[in-house]
């Protein structure tokens, strides 16, 4: 291995150590309570060394958030069968939202950073970097529109509203499990499936009033 290759590998290892330390601290103490100095102390680096890799704490979070959303995208593509165009849209939708719950179990630290701590920076501030997240959402709302067109949901339903309702259903089970709020003997997986199925059943009936959500992305 040449000198440049070794230096690059060492730099990548250091950046990884910074991100891992920051992720653990953000989850344990809350984003607003963590400083660059605290991250540096955890890995026994100087704050100046951290700044040579990431200009700010926000940049560290955005790097972690990008990793998390890419992990979510990868798992969604695997679980929902993105390449199976013959699959009914409603099955694809069900799998996609169940995958959010699975992701919260597989990567709880990333899930907490992405969806729980509201003191973190909004990813919309880095518009180009997170374009793939908007694309992921667009693909899902397109599938929802396909399901509406097939009659799986009430004609004229707003795909954005359906997206929000199903996200709330999946997030509820995620949060109860993550915050250790499950009832004694209650099964989180069963709750996630039941909640999403109940939401899908209700969406087939439709809404008695109109609602237009504001996009968070």
Kindly label every feature range from the protein language model.
Residues 14-22, 39, 64-76, 140:
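Generic hydrophobic, amphipathic alpha-helix propensity
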Residues 102-106, 146, 166-185, 199-211:
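Amphipathic C-terminal alpha-helical segment
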Residues 63, 77-109, 159-166, 212-214:
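Hydrophobic alpha-helical connector segments
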Residues 105-124, 175-179:
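Amphipathic alpha-helical segments used for helix-helix packing
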Residues 31, 153, 179-183:
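Conserved hydrophobic residue
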Residues 70, 74-77, 124-150, 160-165, ...:
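Amphipathic alpha-helical packing segments from all-alpha helical-bundle domains
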Residues 1-13, 207-217:
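N-terminal intrinsically disordered/low-complexity leader segments
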Residues 17, 21, 25-59, 63:
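Helix-turn-helix
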């Amino acid at each position: 291995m040449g000198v440049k290759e070794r230096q690059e590998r060492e730099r990548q290892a250091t950046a990884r150590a910074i991100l891992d330390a920051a992720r653990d601290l953000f989850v344990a103490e809350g984003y607003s309570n963590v400083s660059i100095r605290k991250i540096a102390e955890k890995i026994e680096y100087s704050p100046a060394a951290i700044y040579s890799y990431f200009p700010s704490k926000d940049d560290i979070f955005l790097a972690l958030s990008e990793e998390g959303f890419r992990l979510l995208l990868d798992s969604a593509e695997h679980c929902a069968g993105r390449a199976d165009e013959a699959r009914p849209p409603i099955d694809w939708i069900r799998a996609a939202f169940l995958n959010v719950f699975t992701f919260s179990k597989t990567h709880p630290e990333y899930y907490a950073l992405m969806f729980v701590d509201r003191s973190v920076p909004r990813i919309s501030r880095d518009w180009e970097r997170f374009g793939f997240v908007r694309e992921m959402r667009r693909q899902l709302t397109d599938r929802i529109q396909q399901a509406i067109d097939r009659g799986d949901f009430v004609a004229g339903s707003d795909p954005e509203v359906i997206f929000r309702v199903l996200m709330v259903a999946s997030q509820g089970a995620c949060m109860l499990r993550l915050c250790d709020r499950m009832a004694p003997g209650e099964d989180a997986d069963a709750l996630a499936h039941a909640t999403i199925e109940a939401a899908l059943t209700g969406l087939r009936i439709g809404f008695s009033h109109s609602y237009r959500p504001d996009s968070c992305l």
